[in-house]
Every structure is written in structure tokens, then in C-alpha cells.
Amino acid sequence: MKEIIKIFYTATFLFLITLTVEAESKVLTLGSSDAKVTVKVFSSLTCPHCATFHITVFDKMKKDYIDKGLVKFEHHAFPLDLAALNAEVIVRCASSEEKKFELLDEMYNQQRVWAVGSDINKINVSIKKIGSDLKLSEDNMNDCLKSNDAQDNILNQRIEAQKKYKIKSTPTIIVNEKEYTGKVNYEKFKKIIEKNL
């Protein structure tokens, strides 16, 4: 029975990502819209390399560039599975951009806790616990997880990214419309930003 449920969820997810949806995509942004440098990160919340990038690069970049108005940062949802999709839905349950980024931080920091196993119900309990710890209500999170619009917005981001940028892996990092691949530590990333300032 568990195998049938797993197959059902996987098939449903794959079907959904092939649909073109009408809902407007909401990209999470941080920083000045007038910044000279725009950093777009296409990532999946279940991707270990995405978590490493976020944990080792994002906070330093925020302090050194985003908070100073030099860089505009965009988090583009590119979920690779149903668990990542649901985690993105919970992130978008928050009312403010600041709270959304707090949730994003915690999803990456606690990835090894919640993004394990194949039981989507257990995964949902774990991601809702993260939301509860950051003061999201259980009812609000349940409503968000049931919302087709929330899922459609996220899946639309993935579809648009695939069409425009031909994303092959996560994280994909684009700085001022130039793609950077491979392992990116902060020192390497800092040089990329400085070159674009």
C-alpha cells in the first residue's frame, strides 16, 4: 500500500509540473530593486547542494552586499519532488518577505531532519513543525498545503525557469543574467559579485 501511495504522489507531482498554469509566480526577493547586481538562485529545498550554498554563502552575501543595497537577491523555487514543493508552500504561508526568508533559512538549516524518507505525511508534519516554531498557525499551514493556487504559483516558477534558462541542476546561480555552475564557495562568489559592481 505504501508503494502505491508513493507512486501516486510521484505521478501526481510529475503531472503537475508538466502543466502550464495561469497563476502569477511570486519570486522571493531581498534587497534594493535599484541594485546594480541581481543574483537569482534556482533551488529545491530538498537539494543538499542548495542547502550548502544557502548556509555557507547567503548569510555572508546578505551582510556584505544585500543589506548595503548593492545586490538584489531572488530565490526561485525549483522543487525536484513533492516534499520540496510542500516546503516551498509553507515558506510562502508567511505574511512578510522577512518571515519567508526566516522560514527559508530554517528549511535549509533543518533539511537533514525533515527531508528524509518517502512518507509525505511525515514530511509534512516536520515542515509544519518548522513553521510552528516561527509562529505560523497550524490552520494557516493546512490551508496553504491544500491551496491549488499556492502550488500552481510555485510550479509555474519552475516551468518558467525551465523554459527561459534551461535549468539542468540545482542550485543554478545566475548573476546579472550570466549562469554560474559548479561548486561556489563564498570567496569565489564574492569575486563574481565584485566583477559585476
Segments and roles (model prediction):
Residues 1-81, 132, 150-164, 194-197:
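Extracytoplasmic thiol/disulfide redox context detector
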Residues 79-169, 174-197:
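Cysteine-centric redox/oxidoreductase cores and disulfide-bonded domains
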